[in-house]
Amino acid sequence: MAAAALTLRTRAAVTALLSPTAPTALAVRHASKKTGGSSKNLGGKSRGKHYGIKKMEGHYVHAGNILGTQRQFRWHPGAHVGLGRNKCLYALEEGIVRYTKDVYVPNPKNTEAVDLVTSLPKGAVLYKTFVHVVPAKPEGTFKLVDML
């Protein structure tokens, strides 16, 4: 009889725990997020990078003017022309822009260039386009002999 009373008491305790009587225990919400679908066409259409020649042959440029922008070496820096970090060419002095095709002699430390030159047939030479700035002659900047 004592065992039956104990089982009834424990069964009543279990049902009291499992059946919610308080209103707060009726609805419990947790933070959740739906799984995201996969998307393929990321990025969309982007504008061009505007690479190319900025100053043509015969144009007058000042020091610091950008002569051309490029991703790979299409034009090489010549006389009075500097090379930027992103391979852009800029004028080091003011003058007139000239483009020439010259024989390209690669740096012997550059293994890719050496491999390219050695793979060419005997007697073949590489021609590359070089950009030069011909400095403008200074006019009226003479010093008098008495001032020296």
Swiss-Prot record:
Keyword Mitochondrion: yes
GO molecular function terms noted in the UniProt entry: structural constituent of ribosome
Species per Swiss-Prot/TrEMBL record: Mus musculus
Pfam families xrefs: Ribosomal_L27
Keywords per UniProt: Mitochondrion, Ribonucleoprotein, Ribosomal protein, Transit peptide
Keyword Cytoplasm: no
Signal peptide location: none
Coiled-coil region(s): none
Name of the protein described by the UniProt record: Large ribosomal subunit protein bL27m
Lineage, opening ranks: Eukaryota, Metazoa, Chordata, Craniata, Vertebrata
Gene label: Mrpl27
Span of chain positions assigned to the transit peptide in the UniProt entry: 1-30
Region (Disordered): 28-48
